Amino acid sequence: MGNCNACVRPDSKESKPSSKPKKPNRDRKLNPFAGDFTRSPAPIRVLKDVIPMSNQTQISDKYILGRELGRGEFGITYLCTDRETHEALACKSISKRKLRTAVDIEDVRREVAIMSTLPEHPNVVKLKASYEDNENVHLVMELCEGGELFDRIVARGHYTERAAAAVARTIAEVVMMCHSNGVMHRDLKPENFLFANKKENSPLKAIDFGLSVFFKPGDKFTEIVGSPYYMAPEVLKRDYGPGVDVWSAGVIIYILLCGVPPFWAETEQGVALAILRGVLDFKRDPWPQISESAKSLVKQMLDPDPTKRLTAQQVLAHPWIQNAKKAPNVPLGDIVRSRLKQFSMMNRFKKKVLRVIAEHLSIQEVEVIKNMFSLMDDDKDGKITYPELKAGLQKVGSQLGEPEIKMLMEVADVDGNGFLDYGEFVAVIIHLQKIENDELFKLAFMFFDKDGSTYIELDELREALADELGEPDASVLSDIMREVDTDKDGRINYDEFVTMMKAGTDWRKASRQYSRERFKSLSINLMKDGSLHLHDALTGQTVPV
């Protein structure tokens, strides 16, 4: 993706005042979500031994790096060929310059450790080798070139409950294998399952262990991670274990069977509230035609009480999974394939928006928050106590009362040590200033609004969605336009664009740090409005503080 090459021009005839994004001022606007929250961006020191056990030889001695396959926050994935065997592989080259915090480095180390620890499995992408030089960490792994799960389903002309059961079994086996080896994936979603090749009988492979963690029985975790649609209620409550993977797998199976997520809303907080309520819709098509056995499994995988939810082993023992080959072979209908196609294409559009946003995350804008942290940290020990937070908020003109400040302190202090480190402080600032990163939304909107009309029109949407898979078909474009274009004028204005991006977006695609801080802010909001306590009353559980 390149730089924004179009500017928004006023159109007095067409544009509405509320829908027209103003040209951003990069010098004034605050953006706390970019890059390095703990040190100045220059000079950049060279990290050594990010992966201590990596190969000491150069990657070029064994492999030839070819064309680019994809691009993420920290690096680029290339086609990679073994010099001796000529085997085609993938190499994820992670830029060490972009590993700006200790958390970033630990994420990479843990991902490599987990992929190295997991035994070889036909449905998990295999890490072949890791290399490290002055500029990059290189992870050489199996190549998956068969496309994403939903794209394959949509491409087939015939889609049945039996086919969905076969995919569900594979996903459950992956979860079972991970859990039996002490690994919690924490980010199961359709995009993280790819087909190895384009053959009809290609194995499905789980990828992306970047948010995975090792666990022991009884361990509890508090960090809010994952993707909004697939997040278990106990993740939002910051008290969870491996049952979150079963929940996420249950969400995927629900989508496989009907084409839409079970918990949906127009905002991130709305999605979270739907998850906490846990009400499943089994009434609209095609659910009346789906077997009771399938519905039974989904209900038990999406039980909001993790102590009552099925384990991965119990999922595999469920009759619907055990008898997957005997599941009804009646087509689920064009409506499911159409919904899956739209869901997949909408995700692709959001990913392109996130790519644009990622390219505009500016390190320099973080200085304002760094200065605020320094101002409040009276004794300069790198942490902020409750008295310092209270006094500091008064210094910057906050009108919050003592009860609200105490609640902010309790929720933002994720590790419970009684003070806020820099990362926890950023979450407080996001919440207080209600920063939804409108500046970055405006930049992204301008990128897709090629003619500067202050609208994204059908041709511009088509261009945005065209990729290596070719032109999107007209019906999918119409469906996306119909969903996003709420005022039904045949085009997407800025407000409609922002609403789309605030519904279930995986912000980790733009920035892991931004994603983490958004979820902390979401937790603060849910705690503040009593939503988590409502969920406690329904399930009999409590939220740790």
Curated annotation (Swiss-Prot):
It comes from the Eukaryota. Residues 364-399, 400-435, 436-471, 472-507 form the EF-hand domain. It is an enzyme of class 2 (transferase). The modification Phosphoserine is found at residue 227. SMART domains: EFh, S_TKc. Ca(2+) 4 binds at residues 485, 487, 489, 491, 496. The active site is at 187 (proton acceptor). It catalyses: L-seryl-[protein] + ATP = O-phospho-L-seryl-[protein] + ADP + H(+); L-threonyl-[protein] + ATP = O-phospho-L-threonyl-[protein] + ADP + H(+). CDD domains: STKc_CAMK (cd05117). GO terms for cellular component: membrane. Ca(2+) 1 binds at residues 377, 379, 381, 383, 388. It is found in: Membrane. ATP binds at residues 69-77, 92. It holds the Pfam family Pkinase. Ca(2+) 3 binds at residues 449, 451, 453, 455, 460. May play a role in signal transduction pathways that involve calcium as a second messenger. May be a positive regulator controlling stress signal transduction. There are 3 contiguous domains conserved in the CDPK subfamily: a kinase domain, an autoinhibitory (junction) domain and a calmodulin-like domain. The autoinhibitory domain (327-357) inactivates kinase activity under calcium-free conditions. Belongs to the protein kinase superfamily. Ser/Thr protein kinase family. CDPK subfamily. This is Calcium-dependent protein kinase 10. The gene is CPK10.
